[in-house]
């Protein structure tokens, strides 16, 4: 947000590098939340139930809404029941067993999401605390791909 109140949203090629420089990110549950946590970017994750029949879920149930007449109602019921089973919807929160990523759930409006994101953006203590906690959560995994590749190369050379 610039001084005159206008909002600039850049188009970037390397999203995670841009996210690492962001003060806060707004996203949906998924791999991006883990990536944001790894670089220490606090985020607000949105699980909108405005149209639960359109939510993508793993496995064949994702296509349930395509069944004529009753499919959408069945998928709505399955998605809302499934969502209630879990305390958290984002992997960092599941791994930490506490809320590090702010999760918004339910019927969401752009205004509500923006209001919450702006409140967090103005809360320097929250931003700092969440950034440190998220960075620490996956610290031991930093460099895992390099270690794995080195292990594979060592095995190949041993053969």
Predicted regions: what they are:
Residues 1-159:
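Nucleotide-activated sugar donor-binding and catalytic core shared by glycosyltransferases
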């Amino acid at each position: 947000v610039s001084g005159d109140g206008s909002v600039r949203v850049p188009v970037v090629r390397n999203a995670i590098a841009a996210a690492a420089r962001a003060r806060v990110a707004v996203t949906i549950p998924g791999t991006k939340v883990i990536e944001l946590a790894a670089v220490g970017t606090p985020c607000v994750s949105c699980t909108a139930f405005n149209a639960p029949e359109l939510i993508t879920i793993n496995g064949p149930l994702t296509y349930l809404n395509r069944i004529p007449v009753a499919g959408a109602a069945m998928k709505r019921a399955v998605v809302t029941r499934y969502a209630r089973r879990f305390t958290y919807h984002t992997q960092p929160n599941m791994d930490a067993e506490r809320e590090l990523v702010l999760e918004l759930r339910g019927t969401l409006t752009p205004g509500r999401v923006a209001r919450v994101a702006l409140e967090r953006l103005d809360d320097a203590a929250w931003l700092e605390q969440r950034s440190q906690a998220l960075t620490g959560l996956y610290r031991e995994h930093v460099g895992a791909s390099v270690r794995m590749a080195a292990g594979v190369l060592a095995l190949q050379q041993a053969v």
